[in-house]
Design a protein with these regions (language model features):
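Short, Lys/Arg-rich, polar N-terminal cytosolic tail immediately upstream
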Residues: 1-20
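N-terminal membrane topogenic signal
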Residues: 15-31, 163
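Aromatic-anchored segments of alpha-helical transmembrane domains
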Residues: 33-42, 101-109, 172-181, 223-234
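Transmembrane alpha-helix boundary signature
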Residues: 76-82, 105-118
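Membrane-interface helix/loop boundary segments of multi-pass membrane proteins
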Residues: 143-170, 207-214
Length: 292
């Protein structure tokens, strides 16, 4: 019985080769793009045009959606399009990622509404651009940080559970640190709080993506988190952070975060390495040829 012929090596070139051989440089390049993408002054343009919040949200939606094309282009150039599909046993991964969605839903002002401490008043004509705006934030930021930065960090660390953990933490730390850019709008201690919870939501989105193997689960978690988080600021009146709301939000978040961490260490998510084309680092002197 003859042995099957070995697969031919596929030549690695272009941006995929850069991602694998100059990972740090590629991470830096993507972060620079992220800084530019989140700094587009669409709000100032809306004000200059004499529009209100609706125009600002429409411009934000259009701007962020268009800018999302670049990180999605990079996903294909890095040969990581597998993250737009799912891994084996993804159904179990969906169940394991449910705590991430609970964390996001916990960001809605549900308790103050039930207790009568706050009200949300929003017309349909206002909610449509708000809904699309929140979606575009999740699409842009997740395609950059979970679609590009996170897998690049997976290249940078060993291909094992510890390396995966470091990649989750490192990419989420970069995502959190990006929010320091808000200091250019004026110093506020709230910015540092935003950095902290952005790091945590980054970890949450990364785990949802790991469990399912699919980038759009991270987008969905981020979208839901922002949809609830900005709702009161845009359309609410009354008191948001009541004692009851703080307690419920904290307890639910801690329990769900604990479950996510437990699932991460219990579940074998190594299938994403092959699914997302995350190979071992090239040995010294490699000519850019992939493994068999």
């Amino acid at each position: 019985m003859t042995e099957p012929a070995p697969k031919e090596k596929r030549e690695i070139r272009g941006l995929e080769k850069s991602a694998k051989t100059d990972t740090k440089g590629m991470i830096f390049t993507v972060i620079l793009y992220a800084v530019g993408a989140v700094s587009v002054p669409y709000a100032k343009l809306a004000a200059w045009l004499g529009g209100g919040e609706n125009l600002e949200m429409w411009l934000g939606f259009l701007t962020k959606t268009i800018l999302s094309a670049v990180p999605f282009y990079l996903i294909f150039q890095f040969s990581m399009k597998g993250m737009l599909g799912v891994v084996p046993k993804w159904e179990t991964g969906v169940l394991l990622s449910l705590p991430a969605f609970v964390v996001a839903a916990d960001n809605f002002p549900i308790v103050p509404q039930i207790m009568g401490d706050s009200t949300i008043n929003v017309a349909f004509s206002q909610f449509v651009p708000y809904f699309l705006y929140c979606f575009s934030i999740g699409l842009l930021e997740e395609s950059i940080f979970r679609g590009n930065v996170f897998p690049l960090f997976l290249y940078a660390f060993p291909r094992n559970k510890k390396g995966m953990f470091y990649a989750v933490v490192s990419s989420s730390a970069v995502f959190g640190a990006m929010h320091l850019l808000n200091l250019f709008g004026g110093f506020s201690p709230a910015v540092f709080l935003q950095v902290g919870y952005s790091f945590l939501i980054g970890c949450t989105c990364a785990l949802a993506m790991l469990f399912t193997g699919n980038l759009f689960f991270a987008v969905a978690v981020h979208f839901l988190f922002d949809l609830g988080g900005f709702l009161y600021d845009r359309f609410g009146t009354g008191v948001l952070w009541t004692r009851e709301n703080v307690i419920v939000t904290a307890v639910v978040s801690v329990i769900m975060a604990g479950l996510l961490v437990f699932f991460f260490f219990k579940r074998d998510s190594s299938a994403v390495y092959d699914k997302w084309n995350i190979r071992e680092k090239y040995p010294s002197g490699d000519d850019g040829k992939a493994e068999k």
